[in-house]
Amino acid sequence: MNDSILLGLIGQGLDLSRTPAMHEAEGLAQGRATVYRRIDTLGSRASGQDLKTLLDAALYLGFNGLNITHPYKQAVLPLLDEVSEQATQLGAVNTVVIDANGHTTGHNTDVSGFGRGMEEGLPNAKLDSVVQVGAGGVGNAVAYALVTHGVQKLQVADLDTSRAQALADVINNAVGREAVVGVDARGIEDVIAAADGVVNATPMGMPAHPGTAFDVSCLTKDHWVGDVVYMPIETELLKAARALGCETLDGTRMAIHQAVDAFRLFTGLEPDVSRMRETFLSL
């Protein structure tokens, strides 16, 4: 067996993350013993440690890479030696590659993960006008992926309209055109009704946040509907959309493809997407 791989995930509330299992199983399948540690600043021996201390520890201990999640995706940028152009434009990093010399490079595979998920799950979706509900969390990455995968007009709706507009400004600046506008999520149903598709980028649909982010009665069979939530895989939104005959994109595709792209960056190996999906769905 070749050299082992040591990876980690820095964030808060990591117990349910499926990312470690995907990386460990894929590494082993490719003949590389892989250890992937959860580094939870709320619920582990890393509790209370600042981000720089944890990043330095990973360098000293010979980690090959780190995934970064809430609440550190923005805070990690100034601590890195290099950041990809895309991650710099978004102001968020979720993947840090550490080379043999300890040089750190930040990437954002949330963007590529959602984009690849769209290519795979909604290859023929109409993209003239799309609504994204939710500007927090992975909202920036989802919006960037939508616009760079063909969406002509994207309306990002949030209860905090200033946050929605701030996201729009970031994406418009990154892509060099006025593709995104921030709008109020209150009464968004009329806007959704006139759109080609809608993506839920809020936590609504998770066990801790049951329900939907908008009234699904505005949907018709002509809409396509996406969701970033993957626990459960069939959210209330997707269940309602499928009952209408809508094309749908569940949250597993983004979750799997962001890990696929991160594994490639960490190891230089070509991951087996089907195998990583099988691991994800078995958990």
Swiss-Prot record:
EC number assigned by the record: 1.1.1.-, 1.1.1.24
Keyword NAD attributed: yes
Task: Report the active site residues.
Answer: K73 (proton acceptor)
Any one GO MF term held by the record is: NADP binding
User: What's a single GO CC term here?
Assistant: cytosol
Binding site residues for shikimate: S17, T69, K73, N94, D110, Q258
Entry binding sites for L-quinate: S17, R18, T19, T69, K73, N94, D110, Q258
Q: What induces it?
A: By shikimate, quinate and QsuR.
Alphabetized SUPFAM superfamilies for the sequence: Aminoacid dehydrogenase-like, N-terminal domain, NAD(P)-binding Rossmann-fold domains
Q: Does the keyword Membrane apply?
A: no
Knockout mutant characteristics? Cells lacking this gene are unable to grow with quinate and shikimate as substrate but do not affect growth with glucose.
The alphabetical list of record keywords is: Amino-acid biosynthesis, Aromatic amino acid biosynthesis, NAD, Oxidoreductase
Which top-rank group of organisms is this from?
A: Bacteria
Q: In which pathway does it act?
A: Metabolic intermediate biosynthesis; chorismate biosynthesis; chorismate from D-erythrose 4-phosphate and phosphoenolpyruvate: step 4/7; Aromatic compound metabolism; 3,4-dihydroxybenzoate biosynthesis; 3-dehydroquinate from D-quinate (NAD(+) route)
Name any Gene Ontology BP term.
chorismate biosynthetic process
Q: Which HAMAP family match?
A: Shikimate_DH_AroE
* Stated role: Involved in the biosynthesis of the chorismate, which leads to the biosynthesis of aromatic amino acids, and plays a key role in the quinate degradation pathway. Catalyzes the NAD(+)-dependent oxidation of both quinate and shikimate to 3-dehydroquinate and 3-dehydroshikimate, respectively.
Q: Which family does it belong to?
A: Belongs to the shikimate dehydrogenase family.
What is known about its subunit structure? Homodimer.
Q: What is this protein called?
A: Quinate/shikimate dehydrogenase (NAD(+))
Q: Which organism is it from?
A: Corynebacterium glutamicum (strain R)
